[in-house]
Amino acid sequence: MVFKSKLFFSSKKSRSSSPSSSNSPRSVGSDSPIRSDKKKPKSNSKEETRSPNTKKHVSAKGKEASLEVHSSSPGKSNSSSSGSEAKKPITETPATSDVKEESPASVSPIMASSLGLNRIKTRSGPLPQESFFSFENDYAIPVLPCYKLSKLDTGKKEAGSSKVDIGPLRSSNPALLASGTGQFKVSPTISGPEGSAEVCTPENSYDLDDPKESDSPRYQALLRMTSAPRKRFPGDIKSFSHELNSKGVRPFPLWKPRRLNNLEDILNLIRTKFDKAKEEVNSDLFAFGGDLLDIYDKNKESHPELLVTIEDLLVLAKTCAKTTSKEFWLQCEGIVQDLDDRRQELPPGVLKQLHTRMLFILTRCTRLLQFHKESWGQEEDAVQLRQSGVLHSADKRDPTGEVRDGKGSSTANALKVPSTKKAYSQEQRGLNWIEGFFVRPAPLSSPYNETSKDSESPANIDKMSSWKRLPSPASKGVQEAAVSKEQNDRKVEPPQVVKKLVAISDDMAVAKLPEVSSAKASQEHMSKNRHNISWGYWGHQSCISEESSIICRICEEEIPTTHVEDHSRICALADKYDQKGVGVDERLMAVAVTLEKITDNVIQKDSLAAVESPEGMKISNASLTEELDVLSPKLSDWSRRGSEDMLDCFPETDNSVFMDDMGCLPSMSCRTRFGPKSDQGMATSSAGSMTPRSPIPTPRPDPIELLLEGKGTFHDQDDFPQMSELADIARCAANAIPVDDQSIQLLLSCLEDLRVVIDRRKFDALIVETFGTRIEKLIQEKYLQLCELMDDEKGTIIDEDAPLEDDVVRSLRTSPVHLRDRISIDDFEVMKSISRGAFGHVILARKNTTGDLFAIKVLRKADMIRKNAVESILAERDILINARNPFVVRFFYSFTCSENLYLVMEYLNGGDFYSMLRKIGCLDEANARVYIAEVVLALEYLHSEGVVHRDLKPDNLLIAHDGHVKLTDFGLSKVGLINNTDDLSGPVSSATSLLVEEKPKLPTLDHKRSAVGTPDYLAPEILLGTGHGATADWWSVGIILYEFLVGIPPFNADHPQQIFDNILNRNIQWPPVPEDMSHEARDLIDRLLTEDPHQRLGARGAAEVKQHSFFKDIDWNTLAQQKAAFVPDSENAFDTSYFQSRYSWNYSGERCFPTNENEDSSEGDSLCGSSGRLSNHHDEGVDIPCGPAEFETSVSENYPFDNFSFKNLSQLAYINYNLMSKGHKDETQPSLQRR
């Protein structure tokens, strides 16, 4: 039909002027085509159907008037993009001729139903005149919505009356007939000074016979009312047919105004809650500011260094309180992130607590904003576009249908500006937390000028919580679970929230501003800031981290707390290959074999799950450890460890020893190869003994022991395809030929494939990620080795792939090529010196990555070689590696440098019994009984393992923070006499008169001791060199018990020769009995000090010692759980006041200087894990830890220290478990690291 085509063409001409259909993105419910398709008739129908603009019904005679209103000067038809509303008088200009010619001069009215126009921009119900009114004529009278007319009239008082008589209008005005035949669009938002020029733009109009009808007073009144600026949003304008039957009419499928209205209500409700939360934040900030002022006044003189930071917090609190809710909506995330960055950089103390408190206040708003963006951020864009009036501004149209280039196009382009609301934009990120506390006024359109494209982009959907740091792979799953829980708690479950969060986690590095360049940099920075604080001891860390993750002490990577036990076992299994003294290819192949065996066991376990018992469903321990038999033969006979060949091969058995711990320990057995299990793991320093002679039952199986036995089930069984891929990648990398030109590219390809496999993991911190990380480090290590072999011409490959080079260099730093350099003294921060020993000294140090405190025994290589002490230190290390007893000090690392050896052990702050006796004189018999009983249990364990201490004395009995005893210093153990040519001649022993106050010169005397050990505590057979069996330790126990009760050793004298005579002749000065010593105590001491070792008490085992009447009140099974009489009360984690050397020392920097008048008496006894032997040589200076340059120096091949480096995986796993088991305790309580 000609009329129909012209009708559509006329509509197209009027709509083509809308800038929203040209440059603006499509809004919700809109699908307008591009400008190049404007002449296609079909596009008009589609636009008419999808356009969200509502219609007003007007008579056909209204075309002339509407064209007069629609026409305006070219300069005024273009408006600015600000979206501001302004009222402008209607300017009437002649309509363009081309438009008039296209419309017929006279056309008979046609029912809307005949053209299908009843469905344009209306609900799909029946026609109003057919369903509501029973008029006999062919033309029904449309009903105007009364609520709109009343609102329009009240908004324009100049219309002449405050009400419109709707009744006469309906019955008498013929211009409003045929509601479906003529419609015009009302755009209530009038932008710019020319805003009223397009108030009424007819889309479909007809030129009827009566040209004077437009001059009707009623029509003019209606025109003025509908032309007035209004405050309602376009979404609130509904078509007539919708209003006639708003309830019960099915919504139009392409446009859902009721849904959008409901969403607007929800968003308005959220903003209202945000405003209320902002008021509460303001109140809390004012109270917080008052507290800051009080703290400022109190610390003005005592702590001036705190004042600057407190002033900054005051300024920030005041600024946030004065910020309006709308501005705070945009800026709160940036403020919180900057504040959290500063908090992580602060050490524990008042300032960090103040930052935490302010974060607690401000995050009340950020949490609400986070919930809003995660739930409704994408849907809000369409509402904001509609509310802003940009897409519906009437001043964007001109009669010719062409879009002007000037301001109109700039308005459309403004819509493409990145969202300032999401991810807090560049303005928010640029807020400097000190200099930028002032609030920058945001542009008026900033909260709204967002496009649908921006909102649909995963990088621009709100960043979960954009102030939080980029989550590490280990904590990603935990964060998703936490967000999901928050969504469920709020009973808002929008679809695909989890998918959005995953996409956000992957794309945040790209979406973030240049300050945070990549996810890797953010993760490393987070780990560095979070864990470089003075946590020190690990026993009482409640708030492990904000994201429920800890740093694994084995791999030193962040892992979720839910997988600590499984990860510890898996990580220990993967880490052992870095312990092996083999090449990269062998280690890669070993990893591949292990992965294949794990996969086979998982498949076998699944096939037998239906018929096997729960124990049978566990993974086979033997199959997981078979590969160790190939790499390192096991040492089955511990009795051989005292021999020379055992010392030669023992470094090769370090990992088999550990794997025996993992796989060969029977469940809940009383006696194990490595000693009894601890009932509380690291939770107590004295958990009891489970040796066969005195089993101490535990209340529950030790999770760590079960973990190391391999009895835990794998939780990532569904990842075995990825395990197979990891094994293939490891084999491929191992088979890369070093001389092949394609080896570099092959390794790079393996790295790329490896990262893809790791990214596809289903679980964090378990087999795929843990083994994948190990394989990656090994491949990078081999990559460096190959690069070193390439000539300069081929070395340009490294420069062509700079990111991979950065990764390789980073990997080399964490996993060096040389085995002995895997850990160094540079990984520790030296805090202070604790004591001085024969070959070095003991220092208190803190691990840089974890903050744990350790006692490091520093030994000089040259002194040990010169004094023939090499075997003794190797034996001590081996004993500590294998020790598994709550009364024996724990060992964690050993490493070496060019000058020194380092033994890293647990730091026990209670001091030693020599220091205690020096302060309090002697012990009462009840307390001495308990302490000696714990020593008996420690010796029972050591003797059952074939270890003889041979240097027991109060100096080597340490006090843990819970007051229980720990045995240390095994330097003379197993090896016997170090140098039989050393004599005992020299000045008087320091132990001769420990508590004689009338000898004040004791600290300044030149005290010497033999390399054999302290003469006062040595058994006769050791002095004579005729024997050095286990009974020698029981002799020392009798000496120690005597000293506990009396205050001095029984054989003390002024000269070593006199001590020698007293020991051989058994000259004992007994105190009065029973006044100062009970009969039971004297009898026990007398039997322990029997000259004949075969007749000595304890010659037939510890059982006869424990059965003595002196211990009749001791409950050997619960001794570890009993509360000690003395519990150390340290001021802080670094307090070493309980240690008192036999000499006085001045600490300056990292050096210990003797206060002795004789400079050659620079040797002191050990106080924490160091040997008590003193040298007769006078040229031994103070040990200083090696620096980086010294560390790189290789050790001579003639020195037997090449395989000295070791990482005690099982003890590190205990720390992981202890962090979890002690997580509920108050972190403010001072506590020191313990097992």
Curated annotation (Swiss-Prot):
SUPFAM superfamilies from the UniProt entry: Protein kinase-like (PK-like)
Domain AGC-kinase C-terminal residues, every copy: 1112-1216
GO cellular component, one term: root hair
Record-given protein name: Probable serine/threonine protein kinase IRE3
EC number(s) reported in the record: 2.7.11.1
Record has ATP-binding as a keyword: yes
Region (Disordered) residue spans: 1-111, 187-214, 387-413, 445-494, 675-699, 1155-1174
Sorted UniProt keywords: ATP-binding, Kinase, Metal-binding, Nucleotide-binding, Phosphoprotein, Serine/threonine-protein kinase, Transferase, Zinc, Zinc-finger
C2H2-type ZnF: 552-571
Top enzyme class: transferase
Modified residues (Phosphoserine): 32, 1010
Domain of life: Eukaryota
Domain called Protein kinase: residue spans: 828-1111
